[in-house]
């Protein structure tokens, strides 16, 4: 299967098996396929987009005054884009709502997170959909975790308002100090929050787990038992404490 930078992929079972490490047999097994959303093929895009982060909304809820619906997509791109005659910047987060739920061939775009308003450039992000405890902090539904312009830290953004006018409730804080005790030697490239216990293939992910990818190889990740990761590997953080200089996982 071939794809472009504007297409979304999904990773599913191969021959009935969907396996992840480190659970035996400790070999990642599955198949990539196209997920049915192609930003390049939409009539109102410029045909040359590069998606660098995406989240599928899994339930109806309101975040920072914006009513989100199950199946909505939150998207950021690696460069500035013009979609439907509207200019978006790298670091903005776009909201795509399909015209027909589950059919991503047509829909509408709007601005969900305006980087200019809050002086934060989202290079990786995950939106909490439920209240969940991460380490020693309780996150609320609607809290946004993000990396600012290729950072090794994960910030917590608490909203007063999302949308074309984005307003923070207080100053965004460092939730995960990646280049402190965790020893990240590379920037974070992707991020996801598990806000309810989830079974994927042969792995159970407890609520509060963070899934992270780095942009390059790093042989010493973690404050306890360290692991080595290669470029674009996904690994989990089971966080015990948060904050600058005090993050452990």
What residue spans do the PLM features occupy?
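Sequence/structural signature of beta-propeller domains
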Residues: 1-249
């Amino acid at each position: 299967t071939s794809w472009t930078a504007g297409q979304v992929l999904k990773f599913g079972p191969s021959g009935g098996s969907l396996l992840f490490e480190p659970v035996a047999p400790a070999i990642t097994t599955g198949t990539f396929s196209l997920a049915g959303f192609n930003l390049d093929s939409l009539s109102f895009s410029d045909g040359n987009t590069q998606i660098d982060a995406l989240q599928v909304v899994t339930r109806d809820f309101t975040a920072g005054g914006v009513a989100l619906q199950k199946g909505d997509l939150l998207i950021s791109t690696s460069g500035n884009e013009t979609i439907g005659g509207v200019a978006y910047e790298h670091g903005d987060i776009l909201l795509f709502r399909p015209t027909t739920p589950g059919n991503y061939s047509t829909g509408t775009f709007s601005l969900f997170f305006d980087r200019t308003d809050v002086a934060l450039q989202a290079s990786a992000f995950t939106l909490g959909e439920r209240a969940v405890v991460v380490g020693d902090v309780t996150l609320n539904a609607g809290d946004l975790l993000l990396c600012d312009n290729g950072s090794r830290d994960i910030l917590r953004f608490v909203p007063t308002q999302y949308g074309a006018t984005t307003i923070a409730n207080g100053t965004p804080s460092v939730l995960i100090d990646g280049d402190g005790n965790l020893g990240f030697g590379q920037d974070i490239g992707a991020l996801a929050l598990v806000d309810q216990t989830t079974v994927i293939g042969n792995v159970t992910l407890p609520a509060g787990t963070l899934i992270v990818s780095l942009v390059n190889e790093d042989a010493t990740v973690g404050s306890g038992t360290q692991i080595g990761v290669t470029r674009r590997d996904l690994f989990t953080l089971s966080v015990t404490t948060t904050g600058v200089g005090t993050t452990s996982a």
